[in-house]
C-alpha cells in the first residue's frame, strides 16, 4: 500500500490557501483597523477575536454537515468551492472599502468594512473543516499519518509563500520610503495575490 503523493498534494492545496489567508488576516487586518479606521486596540482586538468565537460554532457545524452531504462532487467539495468563492469576493471588497474610507472617511464605510469582514470570516468557516477532512476521505487509514504530514507541509508552504510575497511587495525600505513621504500603504495588491492563490488552489 502506497500513498498517492500527487493526490495528497492536490488535496493539501486548500489547506495551503487557508494558511496563506490567515497569515494575511492576522498581520494586515489589525493594521488596517488601527491605522486606517483609527480604532483603539480594545475594539480592534475584539474584532480580531471574532474569528475564534465564530470557529467554535462554524467548524463543528460545517464539519458535521459535510459528513452528511452526498453530491456528485463528493461530501467536501461543495463546501470548499462555495466557501472559497465567497471568500475571494469578500476579501477583495475589504481593500476597496479601506481605500474609499481613506479618500473620504465616513461611519458607513467603517460599518461596511466590519460587516464584510464578518461575512468573510463566516465564508472561511464554512469550508475550513471540510478541507481538513478531505484528506482522510481519500487516504487509506494506515497511510493517514503520512498524508497528514504532507497536508501540514502544504500549510507551511502557504505561510512561507505569504511571507515571500510580503517581503517583495512591502520591503522595509519601501515602507520607510512611504512613511517618510507621508503616504499610506496600499494593501490591495496583497489581497489580490492571496485571493488568486485561493482561486488556483
Report residues per predicted region:
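Loop-to-transmembrane helix entry/capping segments in MFS-fold secondary transporters
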Residues: 41-45, 110, 141-151
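Hydrophobic core of transmembrane alpha-helices in multi-pass small-molecule transporters
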Residues: 16, 83, 87-130
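Glycine-rich segments within core transmembrane alpha-helices of 12-TM secondary carriers
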Residues: 50-56, 87, 145-174, 197-198
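Transmembrane alpha-helix termini and helix-breaking/packing motifs in multi-pass membrane transporters
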Residues: 35, 63, 68, 99-100, ...
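Helix-loop boundary and gating motifs at the non-cytosolic
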Residues: 1-54
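Symmetry-related core transmembrane helices of the 12-TM Major Facilitator Superfamily/SLC fold
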Residues: 81-82, 111-114, 184-201
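Central cavity-lining transmembrane alpha-helices of secondary-active solute carriers
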Residues: 44-69, 82-91, 157-163
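Paired intracellular helix-loop junctions of major facilitator superfamily
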Residues: 126, 136-144
